[in-house]
Regions:
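Charge-biased low-complexity segments
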Residues: 21-252
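Bacterial N-terminal signal peptides that target proteins for export
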Residues: 1-9
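C-terminal motif of bacterial Sec signal peptides marking the signal peptidase cleavage site
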Residues: 16-19
Length: 252
């Protein structure tokens, strides 16, 4: 059963979350409830806004089920009701809704979610959240040659080659600094692991994982990295960050 959360619009964000809904829970501490709502909104907005995608515009209703560890077990996106679609800016043209819902569902599975207050959960430990999303990612901002799009494409490249097939047992962020020559051969790599701001409780420093990621990074051919470029000295340097969690295992 989905509970009702008050609408909220981020007018300055590329993606705005109109609100979330879940089951009524009058016994829940109001401050804890509001913190969860705010963190849930922040997580979804960040995830959608940083997707490596072309132009995407529209209003989508996303249904998410989280288990007792705040891992997603269900992600379903559909066209939002008319009352949400009518609030999109008048000067934008919605893009293909099927492509948009596929993107939202894919990002839903990649998102790191906040801890759900115990009193909000169902008897089986889960919680269902319904989130109307306004998505405005214009073509100019999403062009492949923009700095932000290159950054997201590079993040996904390193995810595919370093972390995707790793069955991690904790939640965190991995930062990566690299240096390569003009041919893309890696000459230096530094991977660091640290807590995700929404799930500091679930982070464990894993020296073996850190060493493995460093080793994998050193073996990469970065000539295939999106946006790969060298400076006047023939060196390529860069930085990226990746979120990781058990439910992201073997997901794109």
């Amino acid at each position: 059963m989905f509970k009702s959360l008050s609408p909220l619009v981020f007018a300055t964000a590329l993606i705005t979350l109109a609100g979330c809904q879940s089951k009524p829970a009058p016994e829940v501490d109001e401050q804890a409830r509001q913190t969860f709502i705010s963190d849930m909104q922040r997580a979804l907005i960040h995830s959608m806004a940083t997707a490596d995608t072309g132009e995407q515009i529209g209003a989508v209703l996303l249904e998410v089920t989280l288990d007792g560890q705040s891992a997603p077990t269900h992600c379903k996106a559909v066209r939002a009701p008319v009352k949400y679609r009518m609030t999109l800016p008048a000067d934008v043209m919605p893009t293909d809704i099927n492509a948009l819902t596929r993107l939202v569902e894919a990002q839903c599975w990649k998102t790191i979610y906040p801890v759900v207050p115990a009193a909000v959960r169902e008897e089986n430990g889960t919680v269902d959240v319904r989130a109307p999303l306004y998505i405005v990612l214009p073509g100019a901002a999403q062009a492949p040659d923009t700095l932000r799009r290159k950054a997201y494409a590079q993040r996904d490249f390193f995810w595919q080659h370093l972390l995707r097939d790793q069955p991690v047992t904790s939640i965190g962020k991995a930062s990566l600094y690299y240096q390569a020559n003009a041919q893309g051969k890696v000459e230096g790599c530094l991977v660091q692991l640290y807590p995700h701001p929404l799930r500091t409780d679930a982070f464990r420093l894993d020296g073996n994982l850190q060493a493995l990621l460093n080793s994998r990074c050193m073996a990469l051919d970065l000539s295939k990295l999106p946006g790969f470029a060298v400076d006047a000295q023939g060196q390529a340097t860069g930085y990226t960050e990746m979120d990781y969690a058990p439910w992201r295992f073997n997901r794109p």
